[in-house]
Amino acid sequence: MRINSELANKFSASTVHLEHITTALSCLTPFGSKDDVLIFIDADGLSFVRENNHVIKIQLLLSRELFMSYSYRNETEDHMKLCVKINHILDSVSVMNRNSDDIVECTLSYDGHGSPFVLIFEDSFISERVEYSTYLIKDFDTNGLELDRERISFEAIIKGEALHSALKDLKEIGCKECYVYAKTEANDENVFALISKSQLGFSKIKLPSNRSILEKLQVFDGDSTTVIDGFAVIGFFDFTSFDKIRKSTKIASKVLFRMDVHGVLSVNILSQTDDVIITDTTRPSNNRPGSIRQLQLPKDYPGIVIEVCMLEKESIDEAAQTEIELLMETNELGNRNSFKKSTIRKRYGTDKGNETSNDNLLQLNGKKIKLPSEEENNKNRESEDEENHCKYPTKDIPIFF
């Protein structure tokens, strides 16, 4: 018997694709499996948002096309938001999906502030209702975690499988800090690499430049429009934060990297709708018929859409930039190619037109430091020598090497 009382709620939606939802919500667990997740509900679907320490944020969208029925009726608000524990929802959906040999239909419902978030699971024999208490918190402070689309420094589209393999390799070698390196040349020799910095030193993973792996790579002059060649863009990130996208890249067909001049990296992950199911080998699975285990997703469903924004750890200095350039010019045999230091986009430089910033690395009081002339130095040294009654020897004494 189907339960129709949920149709009176402001929001209700039904689906049979529980394993797909399990796969999607699992991408949130690296950002805190037992932490709060902020859910936005509107006419287009459900968005799940998590933020960690104001340095990285994930937003995952489940489009309304995933659901057999989808209803959003709210005359006063264009969206509703609530906060729950992500592991509560994930555990309920995954357990019901694995413990039933029948097709399970899941109905989600919510009736606004103060009401519980309800999940109803139904198969041919039973119906189970689960209610989760909800509460409201302030929106996550995303100031500084928004990509400046008018000041993009580079953009790359990468095959998801290749990126996941690279991240897995970085994890296995104990990467602590990660450099993202992007450079284009006029002869279409594009270079996109992930560079590991660990106790073992530097290691680089250079992605193949063929379009089947690196579909697109463009370096901009900091304005999102002017494409330039021969310039390297280098981002520096803490690998603990950077590695949080690895689980999402496992289901990705394509991954879009965009980095702005402020050091914000945006990672857009799009999954294909035909092969996003990931089997959890740590849990026993019932032998269900293949037609039930692999239910066809709706043709108009765009797939799991994920956006991750993260802040650069710090701005790297010129010495580190040169070191990375030398590493990229060294081949697999340890031989260095004809090294030609390329121009690197300085995204944190001071204003060249500001005279108060010239030659003043410490920026003391915003004033320009005046260096003493050689003549003044000689006068000061002579006066000090006279006071100390010291005389320098003549220059006729031979110098021995």
Swiss-Prot record:
Family according to the record: Belongs to the rad1 family.
Pfam families associated with the record: Rad1 (PF02144)
UniProt GO molecular function: damaged DNA binding; double-stranded DNA binding; nuclease activity
Protein name as it appears in the record: DNA damage checkpoint control protein RAD17
Disordered: annotated span: 367-393
Keywords, in A-Z order: DNA damage, DNA repair, DNA-binding, Hydrolase, Nuclease, Nucleus, Phosphoprotein
GO cellular component, one term: nucleus
Basic and acidic residues bias (residue ranges): 371-393
Protein function: Component of the checkpoint clamp complex involved in the surveillance mechanism that allows the DNA repair pathways to act to restore the integrity of the DNA prior to DNA synthesis or separation of the replicated chromosomes. Associates with sites of DNA damage and modulates the MEC1 signaling pathway and the activation of RAD53 in response to DNA damage at phase G1. The complex also physically regulates DNA polymerase zeta-dependent mutagenesis by controlling the access of polymerase zeta to damaged DNA.
GO BP term (any one): reciprocal meiotic recombination
Documented effect of changing residue 128 to K: In RAD17-1; UV-sensitive
Subcellular location: Nucleus
Miscellaneous field: Present with 189 molecules/cell in log phase SD medium.
Assembly: Component of the checkpoint clamp complex composed of DDC1, MEC3 and RAD17. The interaction with MEC3 is performed in a RAD17-dependent manner. The checkpoint clamp complex loads onto DNA. Interacts with the DNA polymerase zeta subunit REV7. 2 RAD17 subunits also form a heterotrimer with one MEC3 subunit.
Chain positions with Phosphoserine modification: 383
Primary location class: nucleus
Species this chain originates from: Saccharomyces cerevisiae (strain ATCC 204508 / S288c) (Baker's yeast)
